[in-house]
Amino acid sequence: MTKHIFVTGGVVSSLGKGLTSASIGMVLERRGLRVRMQKLDPYINVDPGTMSPYQHGEVYVLDDGSETDLDLGHYERFTSGKLNRDCNYTTGQIYLSVIEKERRGQFLGKTVQVIPHVTNEIKRVIKRMGGDDVDVVITEIGGTVGDIESLPFLEAIRQFSLDAGRENCLYMHLTLVPYLKAADELKTKPTQHSVGQLREIGIQPDVLVCRCEQSISRDDRDKIALFCNVEPEAVIEEKDKDFSIYEVPLSLVDNKLDELIVKKLGLTSAGSLDMTPWNDLLHRLRNPRHEISIAVVGKYAEHKDAYKSIYESLDHAGMHHDAQIRIGRIQSSDIEREGAERLLSGFHGILVPGGFGERGVEGKVQAIQFARERNVPFFGICLGMQTAVIEYGRNVLGLEKAHSTEFDKDTPHPVICLLDEQQNVIDLGGTMRLGSQPSRLVADSKAIQAYGREEIDERHRHRYEFNNEYRKAFEDAGMRFTGLSPDGGLVEIVEIDSHPWFVAAQFHPEFKSKPLKSHPLFTDFIEAAINRRKQRVTEEIASETEKPTAS
């Protein structure tokens, strides 16, 4: 029988339910259990695909083309499972499914209501995650207890234990125990009230995971347990991690959360826990042999979640090379005002990620020109590849006003144009070229050197592509097209051989990087940045040596 863990959050938002859920999934996998992850989001959008990064953070794309919440990135990075569209549902999807069933007459003339029809649909998508090939399903409920948007989901998971059996369900509530500096004490009252709201709905938490700045004393732990009706050992401390999010699983293990879950759910098939690879990972993170700085030049750089997977992938590659990565978040629009020289000098590598819309595009072009002309390792992703093509067209081929038709429909040199399949598309949501697509790599390229194989599959999210009418001109001018779709029609990777490391990809490699298995393109990019730093140190030493001495 599949066991279910439901993770809710209270007191405030942004407590880290996704990271905690992913950490639990990883630890249970380390005990030999088969785990599936799911996120239920209470917003009415069908998916986050059309939401602003400032509102929602990055959109995380799955192999099947689903545009999902960024928490699914945590799930895939921490656990071994490949997720699909069943792993992320929104209120919009749930209501859409219910309305479509009503239109087909599946409710036989009944009045369609939140209870039972909407809650039944929610229970259906949760139940579908189980099966003979899975031991534990971890379902995270988005939002905060007390929000009106979350009520149907909370009611559904309350009912779910009646259907599946209370012994097969575990309710875990993530809460905040704030520290008041003036009183020099932790306050448990917000947690008590949050749990009280859950109990009013009919859910008694089995485990409380308490986010805190300071350690929770035994007295406070006993107090929380008493007022929230849980056992003292079920009050789990989760202190803030200033060093790395990859400490979270070890913190939960130190608090014996995995043992508690195994005990409460009767997971007799669970084996002993081996966290050796994770401990080794953190050892490398704490003891770097190199320190390099990478500039991420983006449209949404001031919002830390907008490029979440990019930053994590850089850290993965850094750990692979025993390197500490200092990330400079540079607004591309700032480069337009202040210049690339002022903002980018001193970085050992430059990465230009994806984005939509014209704002800041010229700043990206200037950043790429700086990287190309100064021989700074450069990595372009999605729009980063397209702007690399635009920059090369303007400044190397001499194609004045070369641009993408996304930003200038009347450009005399449309080096980037709309995909043929997108010509008649009107709707924005879910209509891009999405999900995993195959590519073939060209021999004697940096791409094939990184991957070590000719055929790859990577995740995409775009409407525009390189215009093949310009392919020969670019090749003659020194830009190589080293990754192509199987039919050769779509450009997937571009490189410049005369540059130490200049690689740009139309796809999103950041969605397939993991802490214990860094993505090969990120791995080689960071290696190039390390070499750049070594070269600069050598040049500085040589310069000092050549200075004349006083007579």
Curated annotation (Swiss-Prot):
PROSITE patterns associated with the record: GATASE_TYPE_1 (PS51273)
Pfam families (UniProt xref): CTP_synth_N (PF06418), GATase (PF00117)
EC number from the UniProt entry: 6.3.4.2
Q: What influences the activity of this protein, per its activity regulation comment?
A: Allosterically activated by GTP, when glutamine is the substrate; GTP has no effect on the reaction when ammonia is the substrate. The allosteric effector GTP functions by stabilizing the protein conformation that binds the tetrahedral intermediate(s) formed during glutamine hydrolysis. Inhibited by the product CTP, via allosteric rather than competitive inhibition.
The residues the record assigns to binding ATP are 14-19, 71
Positions of region (Amidoligase domain): 1-267
Instruction: List cellular component terms (GO).
Output: cytosol
Span of domain Glutamine amidotransferase type-1: 293-535
Q: Which InterPro entries match?
A: Class_I_gatase-like, CTP_synthase, CTP_synthase_N, GATASE, GATase1_CTP_Synthase, P-loop_NTPase
Q: Identify which residues the record assigns to the active site.
A: 382 (nucleophile), 508, 510
Q: What else is known?
A: CTPSs have evolved a hybrid strategy for distinguishing between UTP and CTP. The overlapping regions of the product feedback inhibitory and substrate sites recognize a common feature in both compounds, the triphosphate moiety. To differentiate isosteric substrate and product pyrimidine rings, an additional pocket far from the expected kinase/ligase catalytic site, specifically recognizes the cytosine and ribose portions of the product inhibitor.
What is the name of the protein in this document?
CTP synthase
Q: What is the lineage of its organism?
A: Bacteria, Pseudomonadati, Planctomycetota, Planctomycetia, Pirellulales
